[in-house]
Amino acid sequence: MRRYRIDSMKYEQRMNAGASGFDMSDWNNPYNASPPSSRGGDDDASSVNHSRPRRSRLDNDIPQPRRPILIQPARPVSQKSNRQGTGMSNGSRGLNSTFNGYDRTYSRYHQNSSRGPSEGFSGAPSARNASGYASDYANSRAGVGLLPNNHREPVRPRSTAAERYANASSMRNGFVYDSGESDKTSEELEEDEEEEEVRNFYMEGRAQGSRSVTNTLASEVYNSESESYYYGVVKLGSAIVDHVFRTMPPPEKYYKMPPIDRVAYVFYCAVNNKPYNNIDEFHVIFNREFYSYRGYGDSKDLALFKVCKRMQEEFSLKQLEADRLAYEKARQEAAESEKLDFNQHKIEEREEPKLNISQPEEVLSNGPLHYHSCLQFATIGVGGKLVIIKPAGTIDSITGHVLSTSSVHVDDLKTFLHFDEQSGKVIESVQNFKGPLIAGQTPTHSVRLYIQRQIDALRQIRNAGDVKKSEVVDALLVWQLLEIMVQQHGRVTGPDVATLLTNASEELGEKTGISSNGTSESGSKFEAKERFNKYLLGGHINEAVESAITDGLYADAMTLIRRLHPNDAKKIEEIEARFMNLRSIDDPFATLVAVSSDQPPPILTNSAFDDDNNWKRHAAIVLANLNSQTAMQTIYHLGLLLAKRERNCAADFCLLVVCILAGYDPFIPVAHDGDETSRKHIGLVHSGSNLLNRVDGLSGTAGFSFTDLHATDIFDYALRLGNNNVDSPLAKSIDYQLARIEYAKKLSSFGGFATDAFRYCTEVARSLWMYVAAFDKNAMFDLCDLAESLQYMAAATPDESGWITTMRGMLGAAPVQESQQHVPQPQPVENKSISSEAKKWHDEHQAPLEIGSRNDQQHNDKTVEKPIAPGRASLPPPTLVTESSSESTFTDKSDSSVTVAASASRTSTLTSSTLPPPPSLPKTIEKPISTPPPISKNVVPEMTPPAIVKPPMPTLSMPIPPVSTPIMVSPQPIPIPKPVDASIAKSPRSELDDLWDTSPPSNQTSYPPAPRNIQPSYSPAPNFANPTAPSVPTPPPAVSSAPVLQQATLGQASIPNAKTTAPPVPQKQPELALNERKASKGWFGSIKEKVIKSIPSANQMILPDDSKPSIVWDPVQKRYVGAGVEEEVVAAPPPVMSAPHLMGGGPDSNKSSTNSLRSARSGVGSRYLQSGMATSQAPAMDTGMPPMMPPTMPMSFSFMPAPTEDDSSEYVDPFSGEPTAPSESLSKQNND
């Protein structure tokens, strides 16, 4: 309800009976007042009991404006004193007359009075012996000290008992007093005096026991001048005060209160037009409010004014509420009257048949109508839909027309929530965040746009006075890390993170932390050290050394070279030890030296770490220069230390960096040591939501912050961008997955987001499918119920919603302990030593095997054993992503149990009853840092592959409908890409794979011709017929053994997939596998292979099938011999090989160029002619046979390498560039 202001001028005019211009000086104006008189003119004792005595008609001549009527009771004075020449009549006292022991001087009239000194109160001569109730009423006011000290008492007014009607000639307004003259003798006067004294004695007792207006209390307690002043403070006019004292005489306790309390009481009576019954309660309430304002520093005048103003406002609100209630009551009465008239009109129309109970007269016969017009009915349906029924006769809110027929409207609930500011903010945030984020489907630029909005919002509040700037910078670091991850598709390096930290540190203006202990450094020395640290922060080691030598910082340069590039230790150690004693432990250089020496940095235990910004430089200098285990451990423990100090954003930043660079999963809870309660894991990424809520007003309504969930979603999305949308560490995070389920519920309740909510349900089910046993069953059932209720609103196909029934069957089946489940691991056919070594390493480190895809598959055609899957309950739900240009997807209609075998290599450590402690790192350093975090074994930071998960296997009797599932290439682990891989350029062959890596779905199983990464990829589930579960498990089809393009590392050129040693004897492929492999290619696959072969590659040599070698190496002649081998034609240097003759001369033979050997003797490339330009109709590399070593060519190629010019016996290996001798096994094989 709106508040009303009180116009001071109108309020003053109304309260002062229309007299404007009232100010503080009016309180000093003289006044006269007339007491109330009885109706009959006689002294009636019963008039004392009247609650509201009437004013006399003689009061019309009172001048306006006047001050409040403050009347004192007349003191008992003998009549003799009146005859002592005082010039006063009517019982008035002298100048120094006393009453009750108190001196009181007065003057009868003031200079501006309307009456003369000899006139009565009404203008007629007054009688000196007048007495009665009116006299007591007036005398009681003077006795309580309500008149100022310098004010003279007025003449005691004439009472009703002394009133006499005068002659008509002397009448004024028809009512006058007698002249007051008496012709009595002196004896009679003395008798009257005695009677008057007795009468006054009894009247005093009567006044004390009767109405409180005649109480005689001490008058010297309070000064009436201050009371008059406070009347002016609250702008209370004299007429209003006069009215209050006449109509609502205050109680006895009123005169015991201070002047401020009495003024407030009179103001209350004037505003509410009624007295406050309980004066003690009023005193308590007033003092509570009064001293509350005083406590805030207000003066007495201002506090009194605020209390009185609040009284006026409360009274105005009560009046408005009463008016509203009266209006509503009148409106209801009018409506009832209209209904009765309407019903009476309808009842008279008897000719119309009335068969429906909804007719007005029938409703009237059953009861009164509650509404007189048609109302709209609404209900909330599934998916946040609002169904509204608008009957005929209602007014359309959009068009404004009256509806002639009833209509049904379906609308989203979110359209009605925009009127609520908080709900509008939530809906706006949901619309800006394009969730769920799916790698390959959600464009990266939309995600970056959302991140940029959060960064801009944080920059807006960075300079606010009530916000800690370091907290804003920490939150900015998290969002900037997410931005660079999305921009670089999940590939982030240590220098990238160091750049973010350096910029944030410079933004806060932090100093370097270098201090000199006992030595004074000049300005040039200080600038030299600053320049030296600047190079180190950028990761420029050589430039830092040169700068240090140039500026005379030899100790810095030698220490840096000693730690990063070991040199003459004896010479440098002496200088280093002497120089490091002068360095401060807060210097980032000291941290770098300590970490590079595998020692704990002093910053972790130094008190200077209390600085909110000091940690950024130390972390930046470590990440910019080191990628060792000790460096990752330092960042990990730095994050734990920040979490212990409740720097949540900074702590999460450090843990996320370790997750990206070292593969540690920070989302799994870690057991605490002893009584330690600090946080050691991440539930949802702290993104500064408490700061962002100040800008957008968005707060979590589901028990968590939506902004934090969005930040965690973006991190998961960025990780999946780098590993082809496969599992990430967040897949088994309970906090994250449950928060996504609650978020999906919120989306479904708003309406209009049914499709997004269903996609969230599907993605959640896909992520936790292998870890469903670790989650609460009730939460999983809620997920199924939500998805089932939204499947029709989201227009989901049966394949997209088939996982709901499967998951219900998994949850309803009897729980099987994970330790009792056995999933056969894929075992290679050969290379027993490598397999046993990998198994031993796996047992020690609890990580999946990675040997098959990187070693055995290069020259072994292995088959994967299919695990026994009685039902298809452990199949993941189909993906909703569409095919994109950044990755390729493949479909598989064959038995999808391959997915189970491939998924068996994922991590599953959540089903254990207790939280696992952080695993220890291998002992590779002599001085480890306290408790090392679980970091991967490799020195180069990369994601540690998750441990093997054993999915729950349902019982055989459980009927579960089959669900289409994407094909998994091989049961290899799911490593997150290394940061080093991001800097390697793709070869033309790999770029062609990106373009041609996807074939259209067919009725048969399709395999990728040359997978770039041995990682599973999901694809849209085609509408295949649901196959029946096989009664006998059959092995899955063998994976094609096409050569895998290996990426070079650290700037080295990629080499072909071959070795100089003799390859093992290939296994004979089963006939079924060969047929399936040939059929899987199809017409499109064969065309693609021909096009790929026709394009030469700079990093790879494609070798033909050499199962039947026709050219062998002759160790005696030191050259290849065989059919079609010709002598090399020696030409002018540089030697050029002659064009080889093609054997067979058939139409399928092609000639190759003879000028391709000009770079054969360069020492770094192959000395063999590349055969990529030649094509053949013979089966290519996808026949399932492993590549044979050394490379030989079929008979149709008639290829012979050119020998060197000299006759030296050295043999040049075409793949290594160094002279080697051919192996004996190879010669023996070729001779055979």
Curated annotation (Swiss-Prot):
Q: Which residues form a coiled coil?
A: none
Q: Does the keyword Transferase apply?
A: no
Give the start-end ranges of region Disordered: 18-134, 172-193, 815-843, 866-942, 972-1069, 1140-1232
Compositionally biased, Polar residues: which spans?
A: 26-37, 78-100, 817-836, 1046-1060, 1149-1159, 1168-1178, 1222-1232
Entry keyword set? Endoplasmic reticulum, ER-Golgi transport, Transport
Question: Disrupted gene: resulting phenotype?
Answer: RNAi-mediated knockdown abolishes localization of tfg-1 to endoplasmic reticulum exit sites (ERES).
A Pfam family hit: Sec16
Positions with biased composition (Low complexity): 67-76, 896-914, 1194-1203
Which example biological process does GO assign this protein? endoplasmic reticulum to Golgi vesicle-mediated transport
Q: Where in the cell is it found?
A: Endoplasmic reticulum; Endoplasmic reticulum-Golgi intermediate compartment
* Annotated Gene Ontology cellular component terms: endoplasmic reticulum exit site; endoplasmic reticulum-Golgi intermediate compartment; ER to Golgi transport vesicle membrane
Protein family according to the UniProt entry:
Belongs to the SEC16 family.
| PANTHER family for the chain | RGPR-RELATED (PTHR13402), SECRETORY 16, ISOFORM I (PTHR13402:SF6)
Give the record's subunit note. Answer: Interacts with tfg-1 (via N-terminus); the interaction is direct and is required for both the localization of tfg-1 and to maintain the distribution of sec-16A.1 at endoplasmic reticulum exit sites (ERES).
Free-text function comment from the UniProt entry: Plays a role in the organization of the endoplasmic reticulum exit sites (ERES), also known as transitional endoplasmic reticulum (tER). In association with tfg-1, accumulates at ERES to positively regulate secretory cargo trafficking from the endoplasmic reticulum to the endoplasmic reticulum-Golgi intermediate compartment (ERGIC) and Golgi apparatus.
Protein name per UniProt: Protein transport protein sec-16A.1
The scientific name of the source species is Caenorhabditis elegans
Name the gene for this chain. Answer: sec-16A.1
